[in-house]
């Protein structure tokens, strides 16, 4: 998506350790008109899929997923990284390692909100090594739902998570794929 690539070049900041900061428009402060364009693009890409649920993981994916869901006119459900007192009933659970936070999370999702009747589109802001997506895919499989595919805003192609998932037959649609990053530049695929 050319608009996204231009925005990354204009406002993104490359940090040591293969970190790309896009917090001014994507995952801390959210530029709603811009994210609307992302939502329209995912709707265009998945127009042929019978999506009934958008799935993401807290926290950065939630805002994007909500905008995308408006174009499909379906609910968003998000996996939580922590148990809370207001969660009850049966849960799907998995462990997910975060590249950015260097932590392993126990991720949970209520069985009330995802089942065999669902056709799921997973939405997330970043794809690096694929751990978060693999965990969400495991939850979808455990629910008996159909995974229609994944929608990623920015994929770090040099970390090969997307390549690995595609090799497994998962439909991965990324709006911008970065093939290389140095401390002062990046290259798109």
Question: Would you name each region that the model predicts?
Answer:
Residues 1-51:
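Active-site-facing substrate-recognition patch
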Residues 2, 6, 18, 137-189:
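PRPP-dependent phosphoribosyltransferase catalytic core
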Residues 51-58:
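Short glycine-rich phosphate-binding loop at a beta-alpha junction
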Residues 52, 118, 148:
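Conserved acidic residues
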Residues 63-72:
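Short Gly/Thr/Asp-enriched flexible loops that form oxyanion-binding sites at enzyme active sites
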Residues 74-120, 186-188:
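Short, glycine/charge-rich flexible loops or terminal/linker lids adjacent to PRPP-binding catalytic cores
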Residues 124-142:
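Active-site/ligand-binding-proximal alpha/beta "capping" segment
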């Amino acid at each position: 998506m050319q608009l996204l690539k231009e925005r990354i070049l204009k406002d993104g900041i490359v940090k040591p350790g293969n970190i790309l900061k896009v917090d001014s428009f994507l995952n801390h402060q959210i530029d709603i008109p811009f994210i609307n364009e992302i939502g329209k693009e995912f709707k265009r890409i998945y127009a042929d899929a019978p999506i009934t649920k958008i799935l993401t993981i807290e926290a950065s994916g939630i805002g994007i997923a909500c905008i995308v869901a408006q174009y499909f006119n379906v609910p968003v459900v998000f996996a939580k990284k922590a148990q809370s007192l207001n969660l009850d009933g049966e849960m799907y659970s998995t462990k997910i390692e975060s590249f950015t936070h260097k932590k392993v999370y126990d991720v949970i999702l209520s069985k009330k909100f995802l089942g065999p009747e669902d056709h799921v589109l997973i939405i997330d802001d970043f794809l690096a090594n694929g751990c978060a997506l693999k965990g969400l895919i495991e939850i979808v499989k455990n629910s008996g739902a159909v995974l229609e595919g994944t929608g990623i805003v920015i994929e770090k192609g040099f970390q090969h998570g997307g390549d690995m998932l595609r090799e497994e037959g998962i439909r991965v649609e990324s709006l911008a794929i970065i093939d290389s990053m140095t401390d002062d530049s990046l290259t798109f695929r």
